[in-house]
Amino acid sequence: MTSPLMNESYRKNLPGTALDYFDTREAVDAIQPGAYATLPYTSRVLAENLVRRCDPAALEASLRQLIERRQDLDFPWFPARVVCHDILGQTALVDLAGLRDAIADAGGDPAQINPVVPTQLIVDHSLAVEHPGFDKAAFERNRAVEDRRNEDRFHFINWTRKAFKNVDVIPPGNGIMHQINLEKMSPVVQVRDGVAFPDTCVGTDSHTPHVDALGVIAIGVGGLEAESVMLGRASWMRLPDIIGVELTGRPQPGITCTDIVLALTEFLRAARVVGAWIEFFGEGASALSIGDRATISNMTPEFGATAAMFSIDQQTLDYLRLTGREEAQVQLVETYAKAAGLWADDLAQVQYERVLQFDLSSVVRNMAGPSNPHKRVATSELAARGIADEGKLASGKLEQADGLMPDGAVIIAAITSCTNTSNPRNVIGAALLARNANRAGLTRKPWVKSSLAPGSKAVQLYLEEAGLLGELEQLGFGIVGFACTTCNGMSGALDPVIQQEIIDRDLYATAVLSGNRNFDGRIHPYAKQAFLASPALVVAYAIAGTVRFDIEKDALGVDAQGNPITLKDLWPSDEEIDAVVKASVKPEQFRKVYDPMFTFKVEHGAPISPLYAWRPQSTYIRRPPYWEGALAGARDLSGMRPLAVLGDNITTDHLSPSNAILASSAAGEYLAKMGLPEEDFNSYATHRGDHLTAQRATFANPKLINEMAVVDGAVKQGSLARVEPEGQVMRMWEAIETYMLRRQPLIIIAGADYGQGSSRDWAAKGVRLAGVEAIAAEGFERIHRTNLIGMGVLPLEFKPGVTRLTLGIDGTETFDVTGARLPRAELTLVIHRRDGSQLMVPVTCRLDTAEEVSIYEAGGVLQRFAQDFLEASQGA
């Protein structure tokens, strides 16, 4: 299935060019006349991939799955690219470096282990906002801290750039992978060996669908699946539900696309689109700019979906020109899209499994919070929802008069994330609001740590062109870096005085950010909750200083005549925003940023070793253990004890947090023993190349609720577990160490939507290294389920209506799993009670494909790689 260009009979000249393409319409209609016209956009792209890459013997059967909408069979997909950020991308390359060692140990040639598919690694997850936006040297200082803390990691990444073929690296300080993908890396239509075809990619981040806005299928996957694709293997899938979402109407004046996407997130969550591929269409969709479309597509994982596509149209071409793409490439996109039936006008007869309607004119000004992206709250309802509170606001003013912070203090206000900074309208809107606030004499509250972290250097250029960067800087929103920063939990340290006051007074402190996630504990350990909002609202909340403030009604200050100044007095008109965007955002800005960034130098120096020289004292990069000992041995699915019994909506932030490492944590204690000063502990995310540090992050979230951790008759929140049979509650890491010493196989019992959130492979690696053999839950998030399989952990799904509560599981039990492990087979979870009784519970084996069964039985993706490579080498 891996040989390229398999079905030459469908290879045709692309009209008006010297290139060829594969005529997918002919291939599909040869099976069922007229079928191509009814296929959704995504099915057409998947069909082209099959026609171009699939074994001819399997082509008709695979295409029939798309035509007949069959969801019971597997078919291969070969993405054109892999895009990575430096956390999961680095851990993937650490795994490949470890695989090279394993191959060398077995007598193979390690230099033969290379990515086959072009892989782009962007260093964007390492920068913490240690110096805020009101520090004029914040950018340089934050970059210096980033380089110092991450020397080990960057040394390894630099080695990979030279040691591996097909790996391009964008160094730190240049932007966010998704925004760079949107503005530069995606050509929309690829050309290789004289053949034009749709650009597609997988990315090691759940927000990879950001570039779906361009009509590019881009799917977020875990690091393990990305490794598989890198090495040239097909990504096997079953056809998902493809749901059409018709966007009608036009947004009301003053409504941003952030407001729209937060409303859409609530709407689509309620419509249960989990795992589906969404296609937006209709007059409302056609009128949205690519910036607005990207804001929507970015939050695909928050919808619960896999992809959120827009088709190619004039907006696409205009955006490609705006961002400095070559005119020949823009014309190729138009020519190919119209020839291949990917142009928006060619989709009138598409048939979807479901069609939903969403009226853009119904959207009001929104936020999301205080702890989930789909928990929308209209700003007009803040008081009714108990967030804005007149009494607490008055008390807070008295506290401020005494030099104290108010209840509900906004301690972090961050314009952050590709969700919004890739949308010029949102950035310019915030800057104009800042200008108006400055003119009115308003200022940021002194306890607010404010920051601006664009996902692209082009943002700085167009803000300067508009004369607005200084307006943001005046309010404390200077540029602190070009990276993910606060959105990824890298908000940096608070002022020590402010932090101590929060601790001493047990203050309810919050964050407001223009990001895409606000799970408890994600943004900062001392921000008890967080709200998502448009960049303009972030600026407004920095002025207000507290979430007890009714942002629509309360006065942000007074003018020279003593008249109250409210949000509507500061909010810029849509006409002004559009005029500034049109005058200030220019193609030459993008060319100035990206032309030098993507001119990769060929270095002719001393040959570099194919094996990495591991540093024994490193706490960032360490040879992985996945080919050694029990991890490479037989599975033991009997006598398992529960490590945790969990409720619904357990996120990968619960399973393996990304934010700052505290000195009191297990990881912090380990780093101190290794000689690191506390100020250089960095984040959990940055240490994921060292399993000895990273495994100590397993369930290290202080917001974890493990129902086994009962103290004085009540479940205690925290990184806690109960060791059985003693019944002793202790810190999670100590419990894991205890079970590891006993060689005790473990299981996790959980509720619905287990593993939602970031595509974090360490959420699976951590539990596997702890000795977890299986996880039984009411449901799994897609990426996390594949990561579990990639690590050799068996996902089991309870039947509808069966839960840990109906089964009365309290953690004293032991568990066996019996039955033949086949795709979606019914297995039996045998529960052994402490009183000697047994309960036989049917569960669904969530190894969904034959390929997943094969990976699991091999012990995981990495073990499977080694086996296949050595077998192929011996047979050569």
Annotate each predicted stretch with a short phrase.
Residues 1-876:
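Fe-S-dependent hydro-lyases/dehydratases of central metabolism
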